[in-house]
């Protein structure tokens, strides 16, 4: 018999053990690896964006079963980085003497949408500058060629995913502030929110 209030243990008894365990946050202090947040049909999830430079001639490769919109986000992120190399402290020769691969793990799962834009910017800039990503921080937001951070949907589900993964700081578009105000305080306890308008603000918060 089961108690009237269903617990996690009851769910396992009824449905069996989970098919897989969601990977917990594990990328703090690394170069080129950034934690993003995604919305899925079954709720929010964390999403890692990885990028790495290899000797080459400036080729940009995108891997991880990405949809067209997500590929466009990666292209925009890289173009913005190239256009702002001086402010970012990047040697422009790196663009000519290296290829960059931008990868989103779990390649068997299709991924699309614009909300990983600022995550891709952060990953790319981290790889070109060698600056590490701060620990326990995640982000979600669309970016433009002008470097503006646009709002995204599914914020509540993404926030819950961040809490499950042990994230403590979140970067969102200033225009998503109203969405956080609608979430019950107990759901966001222990989280610090940073609301931004530009890519530069994202990088200042996310990179060491």
Cite the ranges covered by each PLM segment.
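Peripheral, non-AAA+ core regions of ATP-driven protein-machinery
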Residues: 2-11, 17-35, 42-208
């Amino acid at each position: 018999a089961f108690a009237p209030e269903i617990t996690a243990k009851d769910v396992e008894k009824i449905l069996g053990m989970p098919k897989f365990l969601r990977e917990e946050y594990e990328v703090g202090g690394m170069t080129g690896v950034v934690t993003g947040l995604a919305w899925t049909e079954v709720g929010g999830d964390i999403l890692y964006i990885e990028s790495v430079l290899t000797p080459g001639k400036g080729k940009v490769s995108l891997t991880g079963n990405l949809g067209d919109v997500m590929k466009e986000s990666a292209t925009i992120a890289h173009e913005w980085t190239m256009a702002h190399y001086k402010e970012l402290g990047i040697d422009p020769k790196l663009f000519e003497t290296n290829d960059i691969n931008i990868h989103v793990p779990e390649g068997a799962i299709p991924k699309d949408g614009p909300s990983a834009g600022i995550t891709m910017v952060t990953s790319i800039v981290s790889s070109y500058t060698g600056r590490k990503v701060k620990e326990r921080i995640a982000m979600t937001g669309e970016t433009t060629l002008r470097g503006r951070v646009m709002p995204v949907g599914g914020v509540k589900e993404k926030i819950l995913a961040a809490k499950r993964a042990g994230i403590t700081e979140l970067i969102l578009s200033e225009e998503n502030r109203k969405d956080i105000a609608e979430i019950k305080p107990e759901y966001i306890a222990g989280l610090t929110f940073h609301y931004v308008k530009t890519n530069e603000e994202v990088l200042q918060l996310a990179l060491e």
